[in-house]
Regions:
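Alpha-helical cap/lid subdomain in secreted, periplasmic
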Residues: 89-240
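Bacterial Sec-dependent N-terminal signal peptides
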Residues: 14-29
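Sec-dependent signal peptide recognition
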Residues: 1-10
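Conserved catalytic region of serine esterases and O-acyltransferases that act on ester linkages
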Residues: 213-289
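Amphipathic alpha-helical segments that form well-ordered structural scaffolds
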Residues: 46, 123, 178, 182-185, ...
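Soluble non-cytosolic domains of exported or imported proteins
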Residues: 26, 38-42, 110-115, 173-174, ...
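Conserved SGNH/GDSL esterase-like catalytic core that processes O-acyl groups on lipids
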Residues: 30-35, 39-123, 129, 282
Length: 289
């Protein structure tokens, strides 16, 4: 009887100790290769900072950047004499890349939207047979329209394509175009390779709408300085509030970091952790890591 009593006392003490002094699980980082343009690079660069904050040891990334269409997988592949193309190949040739990330961009005039991604995955597998692939899905550009071109503002762009809102149009882009026309096809071509997506662009879409609806706790402009705006220019490049949110989406998508427990100061009063988590929760689980 005394033994049983002491046993339950011990269990009680251990359970209390666990609650009062939770042990942090330390996770090994990945060796990553990340290739893309200016709607990809800010998150790739900032991920290094957040992995440090999350105590992810030995996270390492090689980031290869080219602006605009030049940063799409197909252009990075076809422009074979460029320094960027050679850097991607030489990095993959080392045979130690665990995660390879790229954009969903492709030539809309091509009959094969997976051509660029497929070429790079084929090359990567030669020396990295267990490599994991992710495709980061960017936002649409030119939120207020292109003053030097024919692209209208987002609302008109959505309406012209038969959608009631830019959110509805973007949801179609993510789920019907990127997932079905790119990812599903790549999975058929590479059945033994893990391929998932990161819904980065929702950070821009949701924060922009929240700002229009006066739902942000910070004084944020739609267009202006990087530190205090959703967009920094007409093209729609990201302000810091978008970068912080989008990079936390990356952190969770790649490393499964619980954002509700992630003690990181974004520099904003708005609960960007919750916004990022909502986006992650809404992402189709069939396309998660």
């Amino acid at each position: 009887m005394k033994f049983i009593l002491n046993f339950y006392i011990l269990i009680f003490i251990l359970s209390c100790t666990k609650d009062e002094n939770p042990q942090q699980i330390q996770t090994q980082g990945y060796n990553m290769l990340l290739i893309g343009n200016s709607f990809f690079r800010p998150y790739a660069d900032h991920l290094d900072n957040l992995t440090t904050e999350a105590n992810l040891f030995e996270h390492n990334s090689t980031v290869v950047f080219r602006g605009g269409e030049n940063g799409r997988p197909i252009n990075l592949w076809n422009d074979s004499i460029t320094e960027e193309h050679q850097l991607i190949k030489s990095t993959l040739d080392q045979g130690n890349i665990e995660v390879f990330g790229m954009t969903s961009g492709y030539d809309i005039d091509s009959d094969n939207p997976t051509e660029g991604q497929s070429a790079w995955i084929n090359y990567a597998l030669q020396n990295n047979p267990n490599i994991i692939i992710f495709i980061a899905i960017p936002t649409f550009d030119f939120p207020n329209g292109d003053s030097n071109g024919t692209r209208p503002d987002w609302d008109t762009f959505a309406s012209d394509n038969g959608f009631n809102s830019i959110q509805e149009f973007y949801d179609y882009y993510v789920n019907e175009m990127v997932h079905k026309e790119i990812v599903d096809e790549l999975r058929l071509e590479f059945p033994s390779t893990k391929i998932f997506t990161i819904p980065t662009g929702w950070a821009t879409k949701n924060l922009a709408q929240m700002n229009l609806d006066n739902e942000l706790s910070d004084d944020i402009s739609m267009v202006g300085p990087k530190s205090s705006s959703i967009f920094t220019d007409e093209k729609g490049h990201q302000g810091q509030i978008v970068i912080e949110t989008g990079t936390m989406i990356w952190l969770n998508s790649i490393y499964n970091v619980d954002l509700s427990l992630f003690n990181y100061d974004t520099g904003f009063t708005t609960d960007l952790h919750a916004i990022a988590q909502d986006i992650i929760d809404s992402h189709d689980s069939n396309y998660k890591f």
